[in-house]
């Protein structure tokens, strides 16, 4: 296929953190008249919705982690099957460029593309390069990064190929970014949003309702809480909020309009995945960020530190994320509107709303340069 009528293969794991930036890029590429095919794993069936691709192919994948040698061996066998399937897909499509968004589901299609001499572009959303991207980086044509700071974990010989584009965000996020920060009056209404990423987070359901119940009664009476909670945690969260004397509350397993709910919030409590951090920055909302613990790479801690250093967020390790500590944080922040307003402005200043367009331009440039060699 020629660059004049290009096809771009996107590879992304089937979670929101990987799919959202891929979706944003796909929309920009489609606007340029470029055909997009998405390669992903079976999880996409629950999260992809109407992904803007002319074709979606599911490729076997697994993560070779854990202590069990048997489990790791089985994962490697699955990845091998995925690689064989990916070779067939890449040969059939003959893409101008293959773009990977991290996670082990991207390894088979990107490795197949590299072996077939298709130009490959990696997008690293986090402040620490993931293991899959690090494995693929040596053979990548170019590496796009979501953060301006030096990304840790990039192989030394691949560092010269880095380009900072920012993290692409969905159209719904760009629409929400047009909403000004809500006014903060001394006795006026307050809105708190709590969520744990596209997969939810139990710790939010364990800590946030208990913390809200500890707030002063006058503060609770002004407060509306919107929280994403896992289905098994809904009843408990609703019961606690129902007894707290709040102005209003809403608890659900998933919010399709989450960007709009971010825009309506005075303060957000969330994990610090790359997409969440990028969306908070583009919309311009202050947040208490609780990085996911236990990660070998500590990527969420690094992401939270980026916004924290900008004055846009208040990072809290999960060991310190207790009802008592969160109640103190909420009381202090809601009692100091100037801190929230300053953090909102700092978040807005850290956002890159045109990241999808920057990345699309880099994809096209990569295809053109490859075609002229």
Swiss-Prot record:
A Pfam family recorded for this sequence: Glyco_tran_28_C
GO biological process: carbohydrate metabolic process; cell division; cell wall organization; lipid glycosylation; peptidoglycan biosynthetic process; regulation of cell shape
Catalysed reactions listed for this entry: di-trans,octa-cis-undecaprenyl diphospho-N-acetyl-alpha-D-muramoyl-L-alanyl-D-glutamyl-meso-2,6-diaminopimeloyl-D-alanyl-D-alanine + UDP-N-acetyl-alpha-D-glucosamine = di-trans,octa-cis-undecaprenyl diphospho-[N-acetyl-alpha-D-glucosaminyl-(1->4)]-N-acetyl-alpha-D-muramoyl-L-alanyl-D-glutamyl-meso-2,6-diaminopimeloyl-D-alanyl-D-alanine + UDP + H(+)
Protein transport among keywords: no
Cellular component annotations (GO), alphabetically ordered: plasma membrane
Record EC number: 2.4.1.227
Superkingdom of the organism of origin: Bacteria
Family, similarity comment: Belongs to the glycosyltransferase 28 family. MurG subfamily.
Protein name: UDP-N-acetylglucosamine--N-acetylmuramyl-(pentapeptide) pyrophosphoryl-undecaprenol N-acetylglucosamine transferase
Source organism of the structure: Methylobacterium nodulans (strain LMG 21967 / CNCM I-2342 / ORS 2060)
């Amino acid at each position: 296929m020629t660059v004049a009528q290009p096809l771009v293969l996107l590879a992304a794991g089937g979670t929101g953190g990987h799919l959202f930036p891929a979706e944003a890029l796909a929309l920009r590429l489609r606007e340029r008249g470029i055909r997009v095919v998405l390669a992903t794993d079976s999880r996409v069936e629950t999260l992809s919705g109407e992904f803007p691709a002319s074709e979606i192919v599911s490729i076997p994948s697994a993560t070779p982690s854990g202590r069990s040698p048997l489990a790791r061996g089985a994962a490697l066998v699955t990845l091998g099957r995925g690689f064989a399937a990916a070779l067939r897909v890449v040969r059939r499509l003959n893409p101008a460029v293959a773009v990977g968004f991290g996670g082990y589901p991207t390894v088979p299609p990107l490795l197949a593309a590299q072996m077939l001499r298709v130009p490959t572009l990696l997008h690293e959303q986090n402040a620490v390069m993931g293991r899959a991207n690090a494995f693929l980086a040596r053979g990548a044509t170019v590496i796009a990064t979501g953060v301006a700071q030096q990304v840790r974990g990039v192989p030394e010989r691949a560092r010269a190929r880095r380009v900072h584009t920012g993290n692409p965000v969905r159209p719904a996020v760009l629409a929400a970014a047009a909403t000004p920060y809500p006014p903060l009056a001394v006795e006026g209404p307050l809105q708190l949003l709590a969520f744990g990423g596209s997969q939810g987070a139990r710790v939010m359901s364990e800590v946030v309702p208990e913390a809200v119940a500890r707030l002063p009664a006058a503060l609770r009476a002004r407060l509306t809480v919107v929280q994403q909670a896992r289905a098994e945690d809904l009843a408990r969260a609703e019961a606690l909020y129902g007894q707290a004397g709040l102005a209003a509350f809403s608890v659900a397993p998933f919010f399709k309009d989450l960007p709009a709910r971010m825009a309506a919030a005075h303060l957000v409590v969330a994990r610090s995945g790359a997409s969440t951090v990028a969306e908070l920055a583009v919309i311009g909302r202050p947040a208490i960020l609780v990085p996911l613990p236990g990660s070998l790479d500590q990527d969420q801690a690094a992401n939270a530190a980026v916004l924290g250093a900008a004055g846009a967020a208040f990072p809290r390790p999960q060991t310190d994320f207790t009802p008592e500590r969160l109640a103190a944080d909420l009381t202090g922040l809601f009692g100091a509107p100037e801190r929230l307003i300053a953090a909102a402005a700092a978040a807005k200043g850290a956002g890159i709303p045109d990241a999808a367009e920057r990345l699309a331009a880099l994809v096209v440039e990569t295809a053109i340069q490859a075609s002229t060699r």
